[in-house]
Amino acid sequence: MKKYIFLALAISVLACKNKTTPAIDYSQETLDVTTSIYPENITKVFGAHGGLDTWNGMKSLEFTMKKLNGDEVTTTNLKNRKSLIEMPHHTIGFDGEDVWLKNKDTATYKGNPKFYYNLMFYFYAMPFILADDGIIYEDVAALEFEGQSYPGIKISYESGVGESPEDEYILYYDSETHKMTWLGYTVTYFSKEKGKEFHFIKYNNWQTVEGLVLPETLTWYNYENNLPTEKRNDLPFTDIKLSKEEPDTDMFEAPAGATIID
């Protein structure tokens, strides 16, 4: 009798060992996995604007700014940040190493090309530009404005990052939608010292392009004691073009007659 029991157990164990477990095709499964390397609050802001995966899939951004002296068209390679700004009287470019200026006529460019070549791109590409390497995030007090409270995230840079590592930004967002609403920023390019005054831009007019929620209008505000006061001016953006194809690299090279900016 014991022999029969032992034989039955052996057959049972062998059957279990030979049993095949069906493979699961995880490509067809929806997995709840958190992979963000960013703080939760800024991750939610990115998500409210279409998500970093969608942004990172794009290689080219072009936008037009409507200005009093004529349209200004900016094209940027999103992967290497080479850029080209076409203005009525001038062209500014960045080839990855040097900033250059080309005059189209006798009009003198009165700005600073090295300061300006990526300035409006940074403002326009918010909040995604705040996912760059070398950034430090910190929660700060909410901005109280006209009866509304906007949670804040302070952005600073590690030493040696960019032309102005002393720059600081504060992104304020809607606590319900997590969409960006305000940007506070300092300007340190000229002084090379940490700024004490925050300037303010309001982001409250959006448009969806290729699945990404991008600004349609930026509104600058006057400021006092590091707070926005009254509206100063609007700057509309039109003809937004996002592409998964890289722009022609030759367009960023300095043409004949251009001046390299030191």
Describe each PLM feature range.
Residues A48, I136-A141, I201-Y203:
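Short structured motifs
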Residues G57-T64, L78-I85, E146-K154, M180-W182, ...:
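Short, hydrophobic/aromatic-rich segments at coil-to-beta transitions
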Residues K17-K19:
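Bacterial signal peptide processing site
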Residues D25-S27, V33, I37-T108, A141:
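N-terminal mature ectodomain segment of secretory-pathway/periplasmic proteins
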Residues K2-L7:
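Sec-dependent signal peptide recognition
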Residues S12-A15:
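C-terminal motif of bacterial Sec signal peptides marking the signal peptidase cleavage site
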Residues L101-D167, S191-K194, M251-I261:
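Flexible, processing/modification-adjacent segments and terminal tails
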Residues P151-F252:
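Gly/Pro-enriched, hydrophobic low-complexity segments
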